[in-house]
Amino acid sequence: DEVESITLMDAFLPGVGDWTKVWLLRDLWHFHFYGDTPLKLVQGRERIYFEHFWNDFAADPKHSVPEADRQFYARTYGQPGRMAAGFEYFHAFPQDAEDFAGFAKTPLKMPMLVLAGERASGAFLIEQAKLVATNVNSVTMKGSGHWLMEEAPDATMTELVRFINASAQ
């Protein structure tokens, strides 16, 4: 009763369906990149680390994360403790998988919007959502990679507003 609707945007749900197919993909090595050694390797090189994701996870790197945002993220994550906190997000995936697998036993009934980049998670997240919810609205963002708000801002906002307005009725 506390959650009226939920939106998932280009990711995956640990512990749901065949999630390890994504978790173990070689190109997604960063899911397993945490601890002291990775922190030391990235320290002072945050921009280099993030450039890989901003460019390689985009359908077109020229329409990915804008330069001002790149500078902000690199500067912010370069502050003490920030990168370690970011790495912990992925370090928690095994616990998330255990938790989500338990939650998935009771399907969500509220409206769920799933936005997936055509050149990123695509149908995978949509199929996962259908395993955990009974009222799934899904849109594959044509020509977009992982960075939906940067690569397809108008289409993404249109879908979000449409969904929120429909859910509010």
Walk through the language-model features, giving the residues of each:
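Flexible "cap/lid" subdomain of the alpha/beta-hydrolase fold that forms the substrate-access gate
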Residues: 2-140, 149, 161-169
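Catalytic histidine-centered segment of alpha/beta-hydrolase-like enzymes
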Residues: 144-153, 157
